[in-house]
Curated annotation (Swiss-Prot):
<keyword id="KW-1017">Isopeptide bond</keyword>
<feature type="active site" description="Charge relay system">
    <location>
        <position position="326"/>
    </location>
</feature>
<dbReference type="InterPro" id="IPR033556">
    <property type="entry name" value="PLA"/>
</dbReference>
<comment type="function">
    <text>Acylhydrolase that catalyzes the hydrolysis of phospholipids at the sn-1 position.</text>
</comment>
<dbReference type="Pfam" id="PF01764">
    <property type="entry name" value="Lipase_3"/>
</dbReference>
<feature type="active site" description="Acyl-ester intermediate">
    <location>
        <position position="223"/>
    </location>
</feature>
<feature type="coiled-coil region">
    <location>
        <begin position="191"/>
        <end position="217"/>
    </location>
</feature>
<feature type="region of interest" description="Disordered">
    <location>
        <begin position="386"/>
        <end position="414"/>
    </location>
</feature>
<keyword id="KW-0378">Hydrolase</keyword>
<feature type="active site" description="Charge relay system">
    <location>
        <position position="289"/>
    </location>
</feature>
<keyword id="KW-0442">Lipid degradation</keyword>
<feature type="coiled-coil region">
    <location>
        <begin position="390"/>
        <end position="410"/>
    </location>
</feature>
<dbReference type="InterPro" id="IPR002921">
    <property type="entry name" value="Fungal_lipase-type"/>
</dbReference>
<dbReference type="GO" id="GO:0005737">
    <property type="term" value="C:cytoplasm"/>
</dbReference>
<dbReference type="InterPro" id="IPR029058">
    <property type="entry name" value="AB_hydrolase_fold"/>
</dbReference>
<dbReference type="GO" id="GO:0016042">
    <property type="term" value="P:lipid catabolic process"/>
</dbReference>
<dbReference type="GO" id="GO:0008970">
    <property type="term" value="F:phospholipase A1 activity"/>
</dbReference>
Length: 414
């Protein structure tokens, strides 16, 4: 799994725009992409999407147990510490798949959703990675095709995120993306600051902490998470890079691995992003997946592209279900087995095919893997001392709330 990542991390992070590494796909780069894809997948596995739960829209797990409870630790040798959870809200109406709301009158929060996490490599992880890796992993959306068919995101000025941009070439971004990234809710303890501010402040804190080391910032996400990864990376390079010391600028590398990303903005936005010479973006797209083509009009692609085609996989059923082509685990299966553009499918990485069926029923039946096998234990039902069962939210979530409240109180001045 590790390969030569520790010695090739600059090249694998896009220092040469992945020249000669994509076709055919370099083995270490294949491992590298899968590593960050797995970190994006953690966001899906931890997210509470059950509207009957009063904790819907939040992470089921605390920062300390996030990787262990989602299966990341046993499957990956790289070790990280989660330092920050990201929360977001929206000032405009968004589809249910973006901001999920609870049916419970005792909901933890009516307007906020957990959007992902920030993690930093431990000393053990640093040895395998070759440097101190900071990761921003944005959670994707649930059932994204619902909005693709009937929701329109008009373009609007993004100068609030990119002040000082050329007024004659003003970048424009879909208003839904901007709203989720920049909105605040003073009534919420989670969204008093926007997702934008939460991410940028934590990145600045971590860079100060590790300013004397080789550091990378890698942003990753699938679907909506891919959009947020690109937007937040461009934000950081545009606004914070000039404030970084020259020595840190020399060693710092900022990379995005975006899986199945919808389009984000117009050609002016593309020109702004491409002017950020220290930003490296690799978009992974699946040939039969339609989502990377949405929204359709006046939008354009950004970054380098690695194209896969899961239709070539002999492990997968022939299906007309468009969701099968957009699923993140299907993408990672495709990365593990893609050959050069005209080649067939062959697993070059020993990646468990059972992972495909975590949220799908896409594997051929002969592999004897049940469909949709990843579920929260007992679907979140907890047995009381008297033997009765009820959906009372994850106990670890209550623990997290207590820790957050304690931390908030400790930060108050007397």
């Amino acid at each position: 799994m590790v390969g030569d990542i520790a010695t090739r991390w600059k090249e694998l992070s896009g220092s040469s725009k992945w020249k000669d590494l994509l076709d055919p796909l370099d083995l270490d780069l294949r491992r590298y992409i899968l590593h960050y894809g797995d970190m994006a997948e953690v966001g899906y596995l931890a997210f509470n999407s059950d509207r009957r739960s009063k904790y819907v829209g939040d992470s089921c797990y605390t920062k300390e147990e996030l990787f262990a409870r989602t299966g990341y630790l046993k499957a990956n040798p790289f070790r990280y510490e989660v330092t920050k959870y990201i929360y977001g809200t929206s000032s405009i109406r968004l589809p249910e798949c973006f901001i999920i709301k609870s049916l419970s009158r005792e909901a933890w929060n009516k307007e906020s959703n957990w959007l992902g996490y920030i993690a930093v490599a431990t000393d053990e992880g640093k040895k395998l990675l070759g440097r101190r890796g900071i990761v921003v992993a944005w959670r994707g959306t649930i059932q994204l095709y619902e909005w693709a068919n009937d929701f329109d995101f008009p373009l609007e000025s993004a100068v609030m995120v990119f002040p000082g941009a050329n007024p004659n070439d003003e970048p424009r971004v879909a208003n839904g993306w901007l709203s989720l990234y920049t909105s605040t809710d003073p009534r919420s303890r989670f969204d008093k600051t926007s997702a934008q501010e939460q991410v940028q402040e934590e990145l600045k804190r971590l860079l100060e902490l590790y300013k004397n080391e080789d550091v990378t910032i890698t942003l990753t996400g699938h679907s909506l998470g891919a959009v947020m990864s690109i937007l937040s990376a461009a934000d950081f390079l545009h606004n914070e890079w000039p404030k970084i010391t020259p020595s840190l600028q020399h060693s710092l590398c900022v990379t995005v691995f975006a899986f199945g990303s919808p389009q984000i903005g117009d050609r002016s936005f593309k020109r702004l992003v491409e002017s950020l010479e220290h930003l490296h973006i690799l978009r992974v797209t699946n040939v039969p997946d339609l989502i990377p083509r949405y929204p359709v009009f006046r939008f354009t692609d950004i970054g380098e592209e690695l194209q896969i085609n899961t239709l070539k996989s002999e492990y997968l059923k022939r299906s007309l279900n468009l969701g099968h082509f957009h699923n993140l685990e299907a993408y990672l299966h495709g990365v593990a087995g893609t050959q050069h553009n005209q080649g067939e499918f062959k697993l070059e990485i020993n990646r468990d095919i059972a992972l495909v069926n975590k949220g799908l029923d896409a594997l051929e039946d002969k592999y004897l893997v049940p469909g949709h096998w990843w579920v929260l234990e007992n679907k979140g039902m907890v047995q009381s001392d008297d033997g009765t069962w009820k959906l009372n939210g994850d106990r670890s979530k209550k623990k997290q709330e207590e820790e957050d409240e304690k931390e908030e109180n400790n930060c108050k001045f007397p």
